[in-house]
A protein has these predicted regions:
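C-terminal charged interaction modules
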Residues: 100-157
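Charge-dense, low-complexity intrinsically disordered segments
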Residues: 38, 42, 46, 88, ...
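Short, charged/polar N-terminal "headpieces" of proteins
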Residues: 1-70, 147-157
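Short acidic, glycine/tyrosine-flanked loop/strand segments centered on an H-E-D-like triad
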Residues: 61-78, 103, 107-116
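Intrinsically disordered, low-complexity acidic Ser/Thr-rich regulatory segments
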Residues: 76-96
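Extended, compositionally biased low-complexity polar/Lys-Gly-rich tracts
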Residues: 35, 93-106
Length: 157
């Protein structure tokens, strides 16, 4: 009787990502058990990148102008404006994620027990929960979320 030899582990199983999952989204489960469909953050998502670049340029120009002013006078009002612009950039980042990375969810309920339908507006609202946004952001950056070997799992869902 011949002993069946296991094939060696493939590097492709460990590192090859799916362009389909990166663009259209992969289903992930948060640490609290909620299911979201997220696309990958990066060059494969040109809408996200363009939105971030355009909004970022405008805010960056405002920040540079204020930094020059702050360096001259060190006005508390100008420092507050810089803080406001930093908060504005955070809001832009969160909105970009909600619009272009978060593709859907399943079985999310509001406080009254009503299912929350997927929409960009609802996504923007949900991403205001910074811990949820932070957890999904990390998953959207990880290559392992989008492995080709995950295609079967995503197809079943």
């Amino acid at each position: 009787m011949a002993v069946k030899k296991d094939k060696p582990r493939s590097i492709f199983d460990d590192y090859e990502t799916s362009i389909e999952l990166e663009k259209d989204g992969a289903w992930v489960t948060t640490s609290r058990g909620y299911e979201f469909k997220i696309a990958r953050i990066g060059e494969m998502n040109p809408e996200y990148r363009s939105y971030m670049i355009e909004c970022g340029k405008l805010i960056h120009a405002e920040i540079e102008a204020l930094e020059e002013k702050v360096g001259e006078k060190n006005s508390e009002c100008d420092v507050k404006k810089l803080d406001d612009l930093a908060a504005k950039m955070d809001a832009v980042t969160t909105e970009a994620f909600a619009r272009y990375i978060l593709k859907g969810w399943r079985k999310l309920y509001d406080r009254e027990g009503k299912e929350i339908p997927y929409s960009v507006d609802n996504a923007i609202t949900l991403m205001q929960m910074h811990d949820l946004y932070g957890e999904l952001y990390v998953l959207a950056r990880q290559y392992s979320t989008f492995l080709v070997s995950n295609l079967e799992t995503t197809a079943k869902n």
